[in-house]
Every structure is written in structure tokens, then in C-alpha cells.
Amino acid sequence: MALRTGSPALVVLLAFWVALGPCYLQGTDPGASADAEGPQCPVTCTCSYDDYTDELSVFCSSRNLTQLPDGIPVSTRALWLDGNNLSSIPSAAFQNLSSLDFLNLQGSWLRSLEPQALLGLQNLYHLHLERNLLRSLAAGLFRHTPSLASLSLGNNLLGRLEEGLFRGLSHLWDLNLGWNSLVVLPDTVFQGLGNLHELVLAGNKLTYLQPALLCGLGELRELDLSRNALRSVKANVFIHLPRLQKLYLDRNLITAVAPRAFLGMKALRWLDLSHNRVAGLLEDTFPGLLGLHVLRLAHNAITSLRPRTFKDLHFLEELQLGHNRIRQLGEKTFEGLGQLEVLTLNDNQIHEVKVGAFFGLFNVAVMNLSGNCLRSLPEHVFQGLGRLHSLHLEHSCLGRIRLHTFAGLSGLRRLFLRDNSISSIEEQSLAGLSELLELDLTANQLTHLPRQLFQGLGQLEYLLLSNNQLTMLSEDVLGPLQRAFWLDLSHNRLETPAEGLFSSLGRLRYLNLRNNSLQTFVPQPGLERLWLDANPWDCSCPLKALRDFALQNPGVVPRFVQTVCEGDDCQPVYTYNNITCAGPANVSGLDLRDISETLFVHC
């Protein structure tokens, strides 16, 4: 399905390469035959004959053709005419190609097709007419293609569809009408398409859907109505689609969803209502969606969530509610969502979360609460979320982490707390997070870390503490982090690291100490990258060990790193890692690595 389950252009390209086999002919003799005794290839085209399938493909793509080439072999199975300048297709243009089952006319500046243009194509299976300039199609255009299974009319200028346009296409499986200018569709335009599985109507100007429109599409599996101008979802519109699995209603102007609008859609697995103007959800908005797995409601205007709103969605796995106007999460807001794995509530206006708000979310693995203004979280608010492995609380106005804020999160792997105003973290408030692998406290207001803050975090690998106000770290604060691999302490106010501060970090490979107030430092063995620039280094005897280490390990302490650059116009960006001396006066401004060895002879 276009833009949702795979690009038709990709299918076309793959088919092209499959068609190119050992019998591919091109170049020296444009009129060469497909094989020694086969039919002649048109002069302006290239032909490929597949011995295994006994199929002939004719490639006339992007040849600047203004009319169809002469001499297309009658045995042709696939004909590629895309990327030309054909303008129109005359009557009976393909009448001798009764074996044709694939015809590609996309991107050929077509403005019209004569009513009899497809005469003789009774075995045609795939027809690509997308990316042209078609404004209308004759009512009987497709009566000569009864075998058609896939029809793509996307990205044209169609403003209306004639009654009976698709009559007789009982085998049609995939119909793409997306990205046209359709405002209203006739009630019976899809009548007779009983085998249709995928219907794309995205990118049009539809303002409403009449219940009769989708009658007879009982086999439909996927319906894309995104990027239209729909203002509401009314009851009974989708009642005749019992097998529909995916419904896209995103990027419309929907302000309201009628009660029981999706009743009877037991097969629906994916419902996208994001990027609309929905202001509220009722308790009976989603009844009947017993098989729903994904519900997307992000980028709406929802201000509150009522208890039991999602009570019937027992098999829901993903619920997206980010970028709304939700102010509070009350008790049992998500009751009934026992199978939910992903919950996004980012970028709302949530200022209060009640204890019990997440009751029943036994299987949730990822929760995003970032971009709200929580200020504080009640203790035990996450109790019962033992399977949660990623918790996002970035940019949430948090000022303090209490002792039992994260109680119950025994399975948490990643905790993101960056860009808050955290100035206080209570001792052992992280002690229950024994499975934690990554902790991000970047860009807060921490001035010190409690001695036992990391007690119990023996699995932690990534610790990010940059852009705080740390002036010192006690020598045993990092002791429990024996598996730490990556430590970022940049952009703080650290002066003199305690002796042995990093000695217990035997697996440490990345250490960032740039932009602190360090004057001396003894490097840690085993490091693979060490950042030290923007410190007021005292380049006297205490720094000799660092000088020797930097000179012996230029890959660990590089003078600069060039950022990977992509694109023709991309300018390389260099990150410098200077060890600039602030003193003594005779070496001030020099890089430690450039100072003569003689200055350290008496050290």
C-alpha cells in the first residue's frame, strides 16, 4: 500500500532488476531480438526475456517518448513506459497486447486517456498511472481490464470520480487514489469491489464520509483517509468493514468522534487519529475494538482522560497521547490496558499524577512523560510497573527526587531525567533500580551527589552528569559502578578529583571531563577516549603523568575529532581536545603535549 506498507516505486525497481537477467539486451543493436528466434524489440526500448518464466519484458522508461513506440511484441508480459512525455493514450493503443499483465505509465505527463485506451488488456493485472496530470477518467475506461488486481491513480489532479468507473473490477485487490483533489465521492463508486483489500484515499479534500460509501467492501483490510479535511467521525460509517485491520484518519480536522463510531470492527489492529483537533474522549468512544493493538491520538487537543475510557482495549500494545493538553492523570486512568507495552504522554500540560494513575499497566515497557511540568512526583507513583524498562522524564520541571519515587521499577533499564531543575536526590532513591543500564541526569542543578546515591546500581553502564554544578565528588560515590563504560562529567565545576575516584571503574572506556575547573588529573588505564579541554591546567610536575599518557596514547586523547560529514555541501566540523596550560606563566597558553620534556626533568 502506498506510503504505508511499501513504496510502489520500490516494487517497480525490484521487478526491474529481477527482469534483468542473462538475456538482457541493450545498446549495440537497438532492434536486436530477445533471443535468436524471438520477436523484435522496439528501436527505442530494451527487452529482456526470462527463459525460466517464458516472459518478455519491454523497457521504454525515460526515453522522452511523445507517443507509444511501434513494434511492441504481442507476447510482451510487462511494459514500462514511465518517465516519458506521452500527454495522452489514444483508443486501442494496446489492443494487440492481450498477454500484458503489467503496465507502468507513471510520471509520463498524461493529461487524458481515451475511453477505449485500454481495449484488449483483458489479462492486465497491474496498472500504474500515478504521478500524472489526469483530471478525469471516463466511466467505462476500465471495463476492458476485468483481471485488474492493482490500480494506482495516486498523485494526479482528479477532482471527481464518475459513477461506475470501477464497475467490473471484481478482482481488484489494491486501489490507490491518494494525493488527488477529490472533495466528494459518489455513494456507489466502490460498488462491485468485493475483493478490495487496500484502499488509499489519503491527501485529498474529503470533508465527510457517507455511510453508503464503503458498503460492499467487506474484504477491506487497510483504509487510508489521512491528510483530508474530515471534521468528525460519525457512527455507522465503518460498520460494513468487519475485516478492516488498519484505519488511518490522521492529519484531518476531526474535532469529535461519535460514540460507538468503531462498533463492529473486531478485526481492527491499528487506528491512527493523530494530528487532529479532538478535544475529548468519551467512555463509549472505543467499545468493540477488542483486537486493537495500536491507538495513536498524539497531536490533538485532549484536555483530560476519563477513567474507563480505554476499558475495552484489552489487547492494546501501544497508546500515543503526546502533544495534547492533558493536565492531570487520575487514579485508574489506564485501567484495562493489561497488555500495553508503550505509553507516550509527552508534551502535554500534566502537572499532577495521582498514585494509582498507572494501575493495571502490568506489561508496559516504555513510558514517556517528558515535556510536562510535574515539579514533583509522589512516592510509589510507579508501583506495579515491574516490566518497565525505559522511563522518559526529560524537561519535566522536576526539582527533587524523593526516596521512593522510583519504587517498584525493578526491571528499569534506562532512566532519562535530563533538562530538569533537579537540585536534590535523596540518598538511596535509586537503590531499587538494580537492572539500570543508563542514567541521564544531564542539564540539572546538582551541586553534589550523596555518597550512597549509586548503591545497588551494579549493572549501570552509562552515566551522564554533564551541565550540572558539581564541584566535587566523594571518593566512594562511584564505587558501586563497576560495570560503568561511559561517564560524562563535562560542563561542571569540578576542581580536584578525589584520589582513587575512578579506580573502581575497571570497565570505564569513555570519560568526558571537559569544561570544568580541573588543574591536575591522573589518567585512568584502559580508557579509549578522554576529553580534557577547557580546564585551567597547571602544567607543572603533577601533570607529567597526564602529559606522558597523552603523548603515548594519541588515539585516546586526540587533539581533535572530525565529525562525520555527509552530503556534497556539508562542511566538516572539528571538535578540539586541547589541554591548554593556565600556568606556570612561562607555558601559559601552550598545549601540555607541546611543552618540552626538559621542563619535567626534575619532577
From Swiss-Prot:
Biological function: May have an important role in regulating the access of circulating IGFs to the tissues.
Cysteine disulfide partners in this protein: C41-C47, C45-C60, C539-C581, C541-C603, C565-C570
Assembly description: Forms a ternary complex with IGF1 and IGFBP3.
Residue spans of the LRR repeats: 75-96, 99-120, 123-144, 147-168, 171-192, 195-216, 219-240, 243-264, 267-288, 291-312, 315-336, 339-360, 363-384, 387-408, 411-432, 435-456, 459-480, 483-504, 507-528
UniProt protein name: Insulin-like growth factor-binding protein complex acid labile subunit
Keyword check for Cytoplasm: no
Record Pfam families: LRR_1, LRR_8, LRRNT
Domain LRRNT residues, every copy: 32-74
Gene Ontology process terms (BP): cell adhesion
Keywords annotated in UniProt: Cell adhesion, Disulfide bond, Glycoprotein, Leucine-rich repeat, Repeat, Secreted, Signal
UniProt-annotated location(s): Secreted, Extracellular space
This protein's encoding gene: Igfals
An example Gene Ontology CC term for this record: insulin-like growth factor ternary complex
Main location: secreted
